[in-house]
Amino acid sequence: MFNPDSEEKIKVLYVDDERNNLISFKATFRDRYKVVTAISGTEAIERLEEESFHIIITDQRMPNMTGVEFLESILDKYPDPIRLLLTGYADINAVIDAVNKGKIYHYLSKPWDETELDMSIQNAFMTWRKRQDEKEENQKLTTSNDQLEFLLRQKLLT
């Protein structure tokens, strides 16, 4: 579980084509999280190649690549980050696409409410941590199973 007193901060990648939103997000959350921003889906992909993130938050309406298209494009290579979608438009088709194609965890409307967004980030991180714990446990079980199968084969051969 994440310890807020530890040195590690939750790492958030925030993607928005409006520079003022990037500045505002970073100013609001930089004390609580390690915030990296990107002004486009293309730049966000570059950031993902440089470092890993717990959470990705993206605006939906951006030129060249929508938030859903961005999330869908990174799904295979970067499956672990929890995805949140922000949009100022009540576009139900975008939300449906985000859930089905972009595998979003949560949808929020703009302008965002600081408390609501902060809670969404915290909840998303708890989900990320739980998934990582499950992966580790599954790996341990696989290793134990492999060892038991090996011992059983050895016993059957003797």
Report each predicted region and the residues it spans.
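Helix N-cap/capping motif at the beta->alpha junctions
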Residues: 37-46, 67
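Alpha4 helix (beta4-alpha4-beta5 surface) of REC/receiver domains from two-component response regulators
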Residues: 69, 90-107
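Conserved acidic segment of CheY-like receiver
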Residues: 7-20, 24-29, 56-57
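C-terminal output helix
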Residues: 93, 112-121, 125
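Receiver (REC) domain active-site loop signature in two-component systems and cognate sites
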Residues: 62
